[in-house]
Structures are given as C-alpha cells and as structure tokens.
Amino acid sequence: MHFIVVGPMYHHYSESVVRTLNQLGHTAVFFPEMPFYENCSYLQRKLYKFGYRTLKMKWEKDWQKRAIRFGQEHAGKYTVFLCLTGGMITDGIMDAWEGFPIVLCMWDSIRRYDISFQKRLQRYTHVFAFEYEDMAYAEERFSLNMKYLPLGYDETAYYPQERDRDIDVAFVGTPLQNRLDILERVAQYISTAGGDMCVAGRWYDDTYPWKKHLFRKKHPALTKYLMNCNIPPTKTAEIYRRSKIVLNINNDVHRSISPRTFEILATKTFQLMNEGQKSYGTIDLERDLVLYKDGDDLLEKIDRYLKEPEQRNIIAAQGYADVQKFSMRELMRKMLRCI
C-alpha cells in the first residue's frame, strides 16, 4: 500500500509512523499539520489576539488547499490516506479524497474535539481510538465501530543499553500545575539528600528574562535541576537509561496508557507513575512499574527504591518484557491487519 500521512509535528511520532510503514514494506509520504497559532509569526499572533480573526481563517484555507494538492500529486491506485489526530481535516479535504480509504488514528480523546469533528468520524473508513472509553462513546453517539490502538514507542530511540545510572530521579515532559507541584517537592528531597535529578522540557520562555526570574522564584528547588528545552527522543531515551527512577506524571485528562509509559519501559528503566491510568489489557500495572497515590507516597517510594537497586531491576526487566508488543512496529502491524 501507499500511504499519504497527514499529522502533527510534535514529539516525532508522525515521523516514526512514516518510517515504520516504509520499513514494513509499504511506501509513505508525509504532509504536516500546521496549526495557525503554533506556526504563525509573532506579528500575526499579536494581531490575532487583537481581534484579526481572518488571519487564522486564511491560514487554514491555504493549508487545506496545499493538503488537497499534495494528495492529488501523490495519490495512486493503492493509496490510503492516514490521518494522525485529524485535527485539521475538513469536509472539503475529505471530499477531495473521495474514492480512497481514509484512516484516522486518534492521539487524544475524541470528546476533546467539537461536535463537527465528532460527526465527521463517520466519514472515515476506519477509526482507531487512543482513549479506550471512546469506543463505547462513539458506538452510543454515532453507531461508530472504533478499534483501540495505543500510540507505541519508537524502538529506534527507546531501547535498553548498559551504562552507569548516575541520575537518581528524572522526568521529561511539559509543564502542568500538578507536575510543577510534585517535582518541586521531589527536587527539595533530592537536594536535601545530596542526590542528582534531571527534569527536561520547555517549562518557561527563556527569551524573556522576567519569565526565568519568575519561575526561579516560584520553584527554587526545581530550577536547579531543570534543562529548559525540548529534547528529541534519542536524548530523552539517553536520560532514561542514565536514571535509577523515571517519573511518569500523567495529566488528569487521559485515562488510557500514554506512549511515555511505553517509552520508559522500553529502555528497561524503573518507572514510578501516578495512580489513575487504566491498563485496558496493555501492560500489567501491578508488576511492570510502581504506582504512587500522592506526593507523600511518591517521596516515600523514591526513598525506598533508591535503596533497593535489585528490586528496581526486577520490576524494570518485567516491564521491558511486557512492553515489546507495544512498539511502533507492532502497533502499525496491528493497524495494517485491520485495514
């Protein structure tokens, strides 16, 4: 099959999907989603804030025209259009793709999108759910038969490698209030204990000195360990392989297992994750990692497992064994069998 993949640019997941499809013997080309607010100029963003809404409308119409033209240039007899999230797909684009199979892989809950997006789901040939509970919702609301397909880890980046684990606790991700609160407490603990910690991600805009000052004032302990920049998967995996404990602090929106969970396990690293996620038949939350209830429980478990390297290794090895079936290659194979 020949895939025309349309998806977002964040975290290299689209790139991983395209590469995997090519490795599996298919051909795949990529057309990136370009949301207005994330890609426009500083001036356009300011004008939009002041009420020039037509800027966004023109941006999106131009993108839609380019997407249709890209499809026309690359479509052939055995073409499948594969939409990753589908956030910028419109009825006009789907009209232009009529006659070809159109597949949607969600990377978020469909309930976080507006009703027009949800109704459009019925136009896809196949729809794969990121949130397990979306399947029942789609069946009830739209008589739509979705299939569950988690977002897998990229095995070219996330794999085990023997090396010194010189970082006691690590976290890689974006700033959320619950993460800030938890990580400030963990940083205070690590500092007092004389350990080492690494937190990576863009947590404030360092082009403005006052934002850096404000962050340091609010989170003095965390600032000491913060690598304030976005890092690629290879660098993320390197941090995991150097860490005794990697924290997985999920947001309150998602309940299904996140790709970050798989990525940590794939490096054969011990993982501490907050309670609230559900396995839905993926990994075993009782043996592949350790869950914590709240901040106090997390600090107790960090203290305990830093002193128990053998137990960490046993749990990490079990998690690594169980996560093998959730690599990007295995999950793309599952998708291909369904379509």
Located regions from the model:
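Glycine-centered loop/turn motifs
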Residues: G76, L285-R287
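Conserved acidic donor-binding segment of nucleotide-sugar-dependent glycosyltransferases
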Residues: L289-G295, R304-E310
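A charged, aromatic-enriched C-terminal amphipathic alpha-helix characteristic of glycosyltransferases
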Residues: K307-R337
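Active-site proximal beta-strand in glycosyltransferases
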Residues: L82-T85, D95-I110, F128
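Short acidic/histidine-rich motifs immediately flanking catalytic phosphotransfer sites
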Residues: H74-V80, S243-K244
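Short amphipathic alpha-helix with an adjacent loop that forms part of the alpha/beta core around
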Residues: F70-H74, Y305
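Nucleotide-sugar donor-binding catalytic core of glycosyltransferases
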Residues: M1-K49, W59-R69, L84-M88, Q118-F262, ...
